[in-house]
Design a protein with these regions (language model features):
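Long, charge-rich amphipathic alpha-helical coiled-coil "stalk/tentacle" segments
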Residues: 23-107, 115, 154
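Short acidic, Gly/Ser-rich segments with clustered Asp/Glu that frequently serve as metal-coordination loops
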Residues: 10-16
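Extended, charged amphipathic interaction segments
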Residues: 108-137
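Residues immediately flanking
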Residues: 9-10, 124
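Short, small-residue-biased leader/transition segments that mark boundaries at the very start
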Residues: 3-4
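Short, charged, intrinsically disordered terminal tails
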Residues: 145-155
Length: 155
C-alpha cells in the first residue's frame, strides 16, 4: 500500500502546473522533439511497409517479401530504441519535478493528514486499515499549485 500512496503522490505532483511546464519545456528541447518526430516517421514507415506486405503479398517475390520483413524489423528495432530514449527523458523530467516538489509535498501531506484526521493502522509490512474514501491526490495537486504560486510571487 506504500506503493499505492507513492503512486498517488506522484500522480498529484505530475498534475501540477509546475510539472506541466516542465514537460512543455521538455517537448521544446530540440533533441527530445527530434526523437519524437523520428519515432513518428519510423512508426508511419513501418505501418506503410506492413500494409504493402499485406496488400501485395501475392504479387511480390519471396526475396521482396524478405526485404520488406527485414526492413520492418529494422524499423521496429530503431523505433524501440528511440521510444526508450523518449521514455527515459520523460522519467528523468518526472523524477526531477518530484524531487524538487518533495519538501512542499511533505508539508502539504502533514497539513492534510491533520486537517482530515487521517488515521492509518500500520502493520509491520503493510497498511492494515485505511479509509478508501480518502483519496488525497486532487487535494495534494491543488494545494501544491497554490503553495508554488505563492512561493513564486514571493520571489
Amino acid at each position: 500500500s506504500e506503493m499505492c500512496i507513492r503512486d498517488s503522490l506522484r500522480t498529484a505532483v505530475l498534475a501540477t502546473q509546475v510539472s506541466k511546464d516542465a514537460f512543455k519545456a521538455l517537448e521544446e528541447e530540440s533533441d527530445y522533439s527530434s526523437n519524437v518526430e523520428q519515432a513518428r516517421i519510423l512508426q508511419t514507415d513501418r505501418q506503410s511497409l506492413a500494409e504493402k506486405l499485406s496488400k501485395e503479398a501475392e504479387t511480390l517475390s519471396q526475396e521482396e517479401i524478405g526485404d520488406i520483413q527485414r526492413s520492418i524489423q529494422e524499423k521496429s528495432k530503431d523505433l524501440e530504441f528511440i521510444v526508450n530514449k523518449i521514455q527515459t527523458k520523460q522519467n528523468e523530467t518526472a523524477d526531477k519535478v518530484f524531487r524538487d516538489l518533495n519538501p512542499s509535498v511533505q508539508k502539504i501531506l502533514q497539513e492534510l493528514i491533520a486537517a482530515k484526521e487521517v488515521k492509518l493502522l500500520l502493520g509491520r509490512e503493510n497498511i492494515l486499515f485505511s479509509d478508501q474514501a480518502l483519496d488525497l491526490t486532487d487535494d495534494v495537486t491543488s494545494m501544491l499549485d497554490v503553495a508554488l504560486k505563492d512561493q513564486n510571487s514571493d520571489n
